[in-house]
Amino acid sequence: MMPRTIIEKIWDQHVIKKGEGKPDLLYIDLHLIHEVTSPQAFEGLRQKNRKVRRPQNTFATMDHNIPTVNRFEIKDDVAKRQVSALERNCEEFGIRLADLSSVDQGIVHVIGPELGLTLPGKTIVCGDSHTSTHGAFGALAFGIGTSEVEHVLSTQTLWQQKPKTLEIRVDGKLQKGVTAKDVILAIIGKYGVKFGAGYVIEYTGEVFRNMSMDERMTVCNMSIEAGARAGLIAPDETTFEYVKTKKYAPKGEDFEKAVEEWKNLKTDPGAVYDRTIVMDGSAISPMVTWGINPGMVLPVDETIPGPEAFLQEDDKKEAQRAYEYMGLEPYKKIEDITIEHVFIGSCTNSRMTDLRQAAEMIKGQKVADGVRAIVVPGSQSVKIQAEKEGLHKIFIEAGFEWRESGCSMCLSMNNDVVPEGERCASTSNRNFEGRQGKGARTHLVSPAMAAMAAIHGRFVDVRKYYQETTAV
């Protein structure tokens, strides 16, 4: 057999029927659902008098539009109906549900891994674009639309076009203060928001190997912002150790057998990718987005580019729109940009590694006057663990609001929004116009950078913190 990439191996293992020039029919191992993109799919099943094909392969939670304060008091009528519909649909069709009273509840892309539902080699889908997060485990995971949600519920399969393969290799040692979020933002900043279109990315190299699972999830999460269908990292001992104790993961002998199989989930020597990109990790800085897409991003110690930096006419127009929407002038220093809000959370950066990183920055400090800062754990499990470690006390004493789990301020579908014209340092994944509220101005950063912005009321190079602590 010809040498294959891990992407090709997982794909080939799940093809039920080859399309012969058309999409292949894939078997889906795990289907994650939430309250926003599933109601119409269940209604479609009822209209066609169909059952859920494999309810044991489906898991549900509510996350997108739930409150993170007084979580049982949902005031928005649409949100209330969606949450009620999910409860009713899961009961009727026999699907496991982590509801608002469950310790398993959380953002769908946080709870899948922490419950051991996400495993190497699986095909995983969800009606949410950031399903690529689960690729951190060596799974082929991608978002689907509502009609596809219905198709998977009723057949446990999906027609999919086989993707091209893209290797992104990053070697070297990251500087102190440079995080997984900075790595993926640097990649998108260099190559743009469309370069991954038609590809599934495999992240390789020393930098990704040295990352924790939480950090790998951050990288794979934002594969979508690079335009890719999905992103993954081959499983290794870090992966196996993480999975070992999880609730739904194989146990005992079954786990050992699974690990032996998972060890084969790696790209063969001599396998050829359709494209390869190589970057030097040691050259990456803490990053801050300045514009209206994640590709408009710069190292924190640089200045906003002027119109002459954009060679294509469309790019010039996009930059002009960004200047106007974000209320920023060309050549302004990133470190001179002041903020009114800080959001630490989302499926990108709401896990224990993220909260510990932010807490380290703010311990003994106070949130700057005029800044509202909130921390939203990605799951109830993360919240419980953070409270065991006393992180909530560090945040609260500094002036942060400590919330219940949910998607929160990542998107303006719930009570947590940024007021029009105000600026937010956010650990989420999208800085589109209106993403955090009408007229809201979003700057994407790492948890450490967000924490520093909360303290200073503006963007500050987090590397200075490490220089100061080293000097002491």
Curated annotation (Swiss-Prot):
Pathway: Amino-acid biosynthesis; L-leucine biosynthesis; L-leucine from 3-methyl-2-oxobutanoate: step 2/4
Cofactor(s) the record lists: [4Fe-4S] cluster
Binding site for [4Fe-4S] cluster: 347, 407, 410
Primary enzyme class: lyase
Keywords assigned: 4Fe-4S, Amino-acid biosynthesis, Branched-chain amino acid biosynthesis, Iron, Iron-sulfur, Leucine biosynthesis, Lyase, Metal-binding
GO molecular function: 3-isopropylmalate dehydratase activity; 4 iron, 4 sulfur cluster binding; metal ion binding
Cofactor note: Binds 1 [4Fe-4S] cluster per subunit.
Catalytic reactions on record: (2R,3S)-3-isopropylmalate = (2S)-2-isopropylmalate
Enzyme Commission code(s) on record: 4.2.1.33
GO terms classed as biological process: L-leucine biosynthetic process
Metal-binding listed as a keyword: yes
Job description of the protein: Catalyzes the isomerization between 2-isopropylmalate and 3-isopropylmalate, via the formation of 2-isopropylmaleate.
PANTHER family linked: 3-ISOPROPYLMALATE DEHYDRATASE (PTHR43822:SF9), HOMOACONITASE, MITOCHONDRIAL-RELATED (PTHR43822)
Subunit structure: Heterodimer of LeuC and LeuD.
Family: Belongs to the aconitase/IPM isomerase family. LeuC type 1 subfamily.
Protein name as annotated: 3-isopropylmalate dehydratase large subunit
Organism: Bacillus licheniformis (strain ATCC 14580 / DSM 13 / JCM 2505 / CCUG 7422 / NBRC 12200 / NCIMB 9375 / NCTC 10341 / NRRL NRS-1264 / Gibson 46)
